[in-house]
A protein has these predicted regions:
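N-terminal segments that cap or nucleate solenoid repeat domains
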Residues: 1-37
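Glycine-rich hexapeptide-repeat left-handed beta-helix
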Residues: 1-12, 46-54, 60-62, 66, ...
């Protein structure tokens, strides 16, 4: 797994966390127990810290970056879907950011809230606890409870923790055939 120090700051990864071999962590990045960082994800904590809390997951091809003014915190059991950008924002516990979404500077996604796939959460936007936001720019549409999307917020934390442990135990690079 590519881990790089930056100006004396080095990534700190818990032994039970899964970091895919093609993920890249740079600088002041903390990945807590049972969290997972998936293939081709990049977490660049060069100007401020990035903290990925226990059991959270940052999926394939996502980018997490900071600014000189703010870092990133991804709450316990939160999900950053495939191909997302999280920039100097905060995600609450068990929040879910759907595939292909962008969450910009100073945005706050509440506990068990969901940002639908493809959404653009503009700077300083707040998605309150338990709410569903969608669109470009993202707007809060109402409570997540009782919607089909609620399943993913509930299922993703445990599902990705189990899948990460399987990858941690069995992923191995293979030689290319000649």
């Amino acid at each position: 797994m590519p881990l790089f120090s930056f100006e004396g700051k080095t990534p700190n990864v818990h032994p039970t966390a899964f970091i895919a071999p093609t993920a890249v962590l740079i600088g002041d990045v903390t990945v807590e127990a049972r969290a997972s960082i998936w293939y081709n994800a990049v977490l660049r904590g060069d100007l401020n810290p990035i903290v990925v809390r226990e059991g959270a997951n940052v999926q394939d091809c996502s980018v997490v970056h900071v600014t000189a003014r703010a870092g990133v915190e991804i709450g316990r059991g939160a999900t950053v879907g495939h191909n997302c950008t999280i920039h100097a924002a905060r995600l609450g516990d068990e929040a879910l950011v759907g595939n292909g979404s962008t969450v910009l500077d100073g945005a706050r996604i509440g506990t068990r809230a969901m940002v639908a796939g493809g959404a653009l959460v503009t700077p300083e936007t707040e998605v309150p606890e338990g709410m569903l936001a969608m669109g470009t720019p993202a707007k809060v549409k109402g409570p997540l409870a009782g919607t089909p999307a609620e399943f993913w917020v509930k299922a993703n934390p445990e599902g990705y923790q189990k899948l990460a442990q399987r990858h941690l135990a069995s992923v191995a690079e293979v030689a290319r055939g000649v």
